[in-house]
């Protein structure tokens, strides 16, 4: 697929942006010995003429003593477009952080210090997952930071690691086994090189949280752990960083200089007192001794655009959309022509341009939502992190929608682990949907809905939600399932009579993300209270420790209880009603590709934001669905994704997909794309699979998996005469 905006982890784009800016900064800064009287003198005169930013700028000095970066086999240093690791993964960029696990892992440098003497007897001083620092050719150990420009080449992995460090600190004990790969590779002598140590990070932000520049002080030796990274030699680097941040700010906005600057280190503050005024910038009288941002401070979303062909960021080149479709961004005529003439023709922009132009016409339709915040969240410059933080949505399931990490002292919520659900539930299925303020979900209405809902407006009105509530972002998953059951299946498969079924078995395929939000599906029983539901989450991205788990959520008075699944399947199959005529919700987990799943045939299959062309297992799972021939509905985050899914379905099975239609229960949050301007929304469009007719379909026009020759075939003439005689004989008897 050419465009992966709706499928790629935002954090990877964020890391690629940081590294792209950092790589440009290192290239323009030159070697560390470059005198300030050189190129930076020329830059000073340019900066003095820049317009002034009224916001306060902050230079943060952030040491790191505990986390190291271990590069796996094949992780060779070298710059490349975006994340350097993408070069190791072929032409397709990585879509998830776990895609980098063979190349990058985290190691605890503190553990290495504490256990060094004990491990020395057994492993000659080597910790599990890391090797002893090797000396250079002359017998000298690698210098700590003098070789920083050379050491900067592996920075893409370092960048990801630095940003993940806080999450690693808070959830180390909760990581699955495959996340602790370095410990498993104990005894492999040539597994990986010495861990990189990012000793210090210099970060320039404004008072609103926009990141403007970054510098990494890295050394490859573990021996420096525990030592305070000295700031006596940081002044030239910090000054160069400030100059580059003003001339080429990483965040949004044109080049500018701050009205005032404050520094987070006392010694560095003194060193910069004579340098910063040369830029026409006022330095605060005293350093920022503690972290003291404004109450609403949060790092703003960074979504710098990139050229679709060369992947250069907007701070490197000027980007303009294609003049015909306005959908794809290019840095100039050369990249536009290269994309226009690509071979084969069906991947060229010449082929896709009119189609992308039609997709762009959906911008207004997809942004037509009833919420009070619609204009903000559907904007191309939507700052999602600031939106969530301003509403106190920084814990529970909300953390999975953004890159915000809970700070020290904040409650930790495990992700995607059914074993933790019992302690998290506490009788309230909406606990993980709450923010820091008042309850977001009102009590369940006493009466079930009397009509079917086909829009967020109707659902919010019945549920007692204000149109200012952002709950639609999480409830898009259960409401999409509800819409498929109540509207789309009756329209496309009326013979199933699904609305009259008392129990439904639904398979949710490739459901790694949806399983991490499993409690939102309780809303299905609120909307369909008289239907017994079984949701089976299937996919190899599910936690391996959750495989074959089975539990039931059941209403007990005003609360909801969670029970293991032993003996529950009988209740589901029998259709026994719970108290008040309500039924329970069963959850099953199968951590495997769908084509390897064994079990009863489902009533319905659903997949969210599937991206058939991005994962090879779909080439096996789609034929499996073809053989089952059950209604299978899928959502996509863009109309482009629907077209690619149709092509993949044709290749895998010879079938196709229905025409996609906008999902009225799509997420209101627009997904910002890096190399294009197309509208991307989670669950934006819905389609269903159109299966290839069975092999016997050409012989008989009547559909059906197994033909019955005796019934429709022309019977022998004598038999027809006998039936006629019988009918004639019966006629007079009836009249008498």
Curated annotation (Swiss-Prot):
Cite the record's Pro residues compositional bias ranges. 704-718
List compositional bias (Basic residues) regions by residue number: 719-736
Composition-biased stretches (Basic and acidic residues):
124-135, 165-185
Its Gene Ontology molecular function terms? histone deacetylase binding; zinc ion binding
- The domain of life is Eukaryota
InterPro entries, per database record: Mss51-like_C, ZMY15, Znf_MYND
The UniProt regions of compositional bias labelled Acidic residues, in chain numbering, are 110-123
Q: What is this protein called?
A: Zinc finger MYND domain-containing protein 15
């Amino acid at each position: 697929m050419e465009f992966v905006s709706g499928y790629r982890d935002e954090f990877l784009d964020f890391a690629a942006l940081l590294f792209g800016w950092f790589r440009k900064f290192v290239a323009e800064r030159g070697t560390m010995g470059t005198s300030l009287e050189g190129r930076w003198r020329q830059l000073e005169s340019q900066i003095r003429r820049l317009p002034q930013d009224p916001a306060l700028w902050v230079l943060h000095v952030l040491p790191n003593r505990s986390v190291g970066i271990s590069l796996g086999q094949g992780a060779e240093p070298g710059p490349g477009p975006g994340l350097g690791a993408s070069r190791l993964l072929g032409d397709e960029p990585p879509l998830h952080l776990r895609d980098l696990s063979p190349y990058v892992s985290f190691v605890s440098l503190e553990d290495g210090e504490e256990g060094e003497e004990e491990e020395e007897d057994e492993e000659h001083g080597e910790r599990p997952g890391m090797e002893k620092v090797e000396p250079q050719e002359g017998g000298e150990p690698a210098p700590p930071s003098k070789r920083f420009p050379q050491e900067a080449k592996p920075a893409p992995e370092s960048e990801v690691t630095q940003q993940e460090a806080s999450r690693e600190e808070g959830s180390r004990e909760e990581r699955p086994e495959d996340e602790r790969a370095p410990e498993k590779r104990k005894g492999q002598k040539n597994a990986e090189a010495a861990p990189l140590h990012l000793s210090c990070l210099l970060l320039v932000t404004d008072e609103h949280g926009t990141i403007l520049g970054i510098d990494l002080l890295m050394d490859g030796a573990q021996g420096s752990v525990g030592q305070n990274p000295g700031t006596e030699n940081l002044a030239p680097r910090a000054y160069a960083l400030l100059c580059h941040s003003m001339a080429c700010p990483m965040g949004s906005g044109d080049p500018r200089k701050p009205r005032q600057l404050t520094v987070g280190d006392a010694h560095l503050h003194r060193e910069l007192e004579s340098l910063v005024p040369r830029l026409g910038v006022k330095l605060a009288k005293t350093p920022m001794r503690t972290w003291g941002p404004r109450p609403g401070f949060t790092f703003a979303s960074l979504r710098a655009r990139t050229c679709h062909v060369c992947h250069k960021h907007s701070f490197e080149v000027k980007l303009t959309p294609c003049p015909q479709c306005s959908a794809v961004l290019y840095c100039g005529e050369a990249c536009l022509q290269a994309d226009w003439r690509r071979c084969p023709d069906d991947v060229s922009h010449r082929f896709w341009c009119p189609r992308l132009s039609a997709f762009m016409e959906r911008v207004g339709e997809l942004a037509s939502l009833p919420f009070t915040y619609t204009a903000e969240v559907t904007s191309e410059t939507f700052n999602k992190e600031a939106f969530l933080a301003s509403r106190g949505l920084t814990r529970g399931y909300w953390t999975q929608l953004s890159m915000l990490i809970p700070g020290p002292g904040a409650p930790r919520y495990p992700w995607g682990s059914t074993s933790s659900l019992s302690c998290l539930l506490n009788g309230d299925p909406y606990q993980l949907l709450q923010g820091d303020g008042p309850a977001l979900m009102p009590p369940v209405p006493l009466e079930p809905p009397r009509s079917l809902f086909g829009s967020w407006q109707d659902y919010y009105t019945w549920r007692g939600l204000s149109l200012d509530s952002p709950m639609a972002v999480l409830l898009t998953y259960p409401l999409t399932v509800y819409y498929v059951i109540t509207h789309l299946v009756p329209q496309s498969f009326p013979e199933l009579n699904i609305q009259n079924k008392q129990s439904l078995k639904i398979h949710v395929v490739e459901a790694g993300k949806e399983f991490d939000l499993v409690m939102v599906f309780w809303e299905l029983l609120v909307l369909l209270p008289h239907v017994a539901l079984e949701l089976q989450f299937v996919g190899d991205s599910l936690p391996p420790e959750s495989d074959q788990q089975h539990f039931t959520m059941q209403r007990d008075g005003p609360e909801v209880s969670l029970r293991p699944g032993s003996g529950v399947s009988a209740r589901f199959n029998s259709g026994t009603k719970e108290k008040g005529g309500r039924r329970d919700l069963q959850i099953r987990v199968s951590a495997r590709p769908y084509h390897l799943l064994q079990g009863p045939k489902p009533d319905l299959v659903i997949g969210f934001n599937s991206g058939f062309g991005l994962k090879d297992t779909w080439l096996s799972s789609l034929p499996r669905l073809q053989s089952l021939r059950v209604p299978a509905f899928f959502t996509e985050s863009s109309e482009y994704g629907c077209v690619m899914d149709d092509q993949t379905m044709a290749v895998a099975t010879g079938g196709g997909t229905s025409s996609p239609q906008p999902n009225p229960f799509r997420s209101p949050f627009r997904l910002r794309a890096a190399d294009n301007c197309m509208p991307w929304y989670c669950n934006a469009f819905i389609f269903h699979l159109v299966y290839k007719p069975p092999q016997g379909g050409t012989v008989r026009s009547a559909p059906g998996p197994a033909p019955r020759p005796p019934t429709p075939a022309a019977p022998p003439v004598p038999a027809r005469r006998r039936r006629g005689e019988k009918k004639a004989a019966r006629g007079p008897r009836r009249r008498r």
